[in-house]
Amino acid sequence: MSLISADNIVKIYQSHSLVGASARKTVLHDISISIGQGETVALLGRSGCGKSTLARLLVGLERPTSGEVRFRGVPLTKLDRSGMKAFRREVQLIFQDSPGAVNARSSVRAIIGEPLRHLTSLDETRREERIQELLRLVELPPEIADRLPAQVSGGQLQRICIARALAVNPKLIILDEAVSNLDIHLQASALALLTKLQQEGGIAYLFVTHDLRLVQKFAARCLVMDEGQIVEEIKTADLDSMRHPASRLLREAVLPPLPVRAVETN
């Protein structure tokens, strides 16, 4: 059974003008995907093709117009309160815009501790122990817990967001362009960390990106998305054999390779 799946997902947005006219825009067309335990799947596509919309649907931030998102075979719409709490624990999302994903007035301790407060029954002492454990896991010093987001670097803040996502031991993390804003060395370091965590804990990833170079380093299977549709599915080892025009355009836009040493040693 898949950990999470989307079955025939359609998403339509309707907008209204000041004079009362309305317009409908279909951004996802009959999307079906599945992700298994411990699997890394890339969702590859240019900006604006619907990747982030699909990511929001998969974590329950939006509802599809038609079709179903299923968690361990059960539609999200059929989950009771305890089932939805389990879903929130097991499926986490890391956004591209890490500064926008955190409260600028909250300390790093409060940011990482947020899911622990809402999704676990840990007391304050155990929460603090878990926060310090997570900081060590993402290779950040303990004193950073007292800082505000503006007092840490971009790479550190992204690691803080990773620590927050890991706080409740998820089974799946959706990375929505989560390393795209980092420089090439920080990208390599972040991917090495995520790979290490997967090897140690069996976490599954949906890696949402427009960068084929990152897919080659991180994913085993690749879904190519264009204009709201999955147009190609291929193993990462076979990326040179991509056939769809949208896939070929992405292949031709590959950036310089990640630094090998950073990937191997971080």
UniProtKB/Swiss-Prot annotation:
<keyword id="KW-0472">Membrane</keyword>
<dbReference type="InterPro" id="IPR014137">
    <property type="entry name" value="Nickel_NikE"/>
</dbReference>
<dbReference type="GO" id="GO:0016151">
    <property type="term" value="F:nickel cation binding"/>
</dbReference>
<protein>
    <recommendedName>
        <fullName>Nickel import ATP-binding protein NikE</fullName>
        <ecNumber>7.2.2.11</ecNumber>
    </recommendedName>
</protein>
<dbReference type="GO" id="GO:0005524">
    <property type="term" value="F:ATP binding"/>
</dbReference>
<keyword id="KW-0533">Nickel</keyword>
<dbReference type="GO" id="GO:0016887">
    <property type="term" value="F:ATP hydrolysis activity"/>
</dbReference>
<comment type="subunit">
    <text>The complex is composed of two ATP-binding proteins (NikD and NikE), two transmembrane proteins (NikB and NikC) and a solute-binding protein (NikA).</text>
</comment>
<keyword id="KW-0406">Ion transport</keyword>
<keyword id="KW-1003">Cell membrane</keyword>
<dbReference type="GO" id="GO:0005886">
    <property type="term" value="C:plasma membrane"/>
</dbReference>
<keyword id="KW-0997">Cell inner membrane</keyword>
<dbReference type="InterPro" id="IPR050319">
    <property type="entry name" value="ABC_transp_ATP-bind"/>
</dbReference>
<feature type="binding site">
    <location>
        <begin position="45"/>
        <end position="52"/>
    </location>
    <ligand>
        <name>ATP</name>
    </ligand>
</feature>
<dbReference type="InterPro" id="IPR027417">
    <property type="entry name" value="P-loop_NTPase"/>
</dbReference>
<keyword id="KW-1278">Translocase</keyword>
<keyword id="KW-0067">ATP-binding</keyword>
<comment type="function">
    <text>Part of the ABC transporter complex NikABCDE involved in nickel import. Responsible for energy coupling to the transport system.</text>
</comment>
<comment type="similarity">
    <text>Belongs to the ABC transporter superfamily. Nickel importer (TC 3.A.1.5.3) family.</text>
</comment>
<dbReference type="Pfam" id="PF00005">
    <property type="entry name" value="ABC_tran"/>
</dbReference>
<dbReference type="InterPro" id="IPR003439">
    <property type="entry name" value="ABC_transporter-like_ATP-bd"/>
</dbReference>
<dbReference type="GO" id="GO:0015413">
    <property type="term" value="F:ABC-type nickel transporter activity"/>
</dbReference>
<keyword id="KW-0547">Nucleotide-binding</keyword>
<dbReference type="InterPro" id="IPR017871">
    <property type="entry name" value="ABC_transporter-like_CS"/>
</dbReference>
<keyword id="KW-0813">Transport</keyword>
<dbReference type="InterPro" id="IPR003593">
    <property type="entry name" value="AAA+_ATPase"/>
</dbReference>
<keyword id="KW-0921">Nickel transport</keyword>
<feature type="domain" description="ABC transporter">
    <location>
        <begin position="4"/>
        <end position="252"/>
    </location>
</feature>
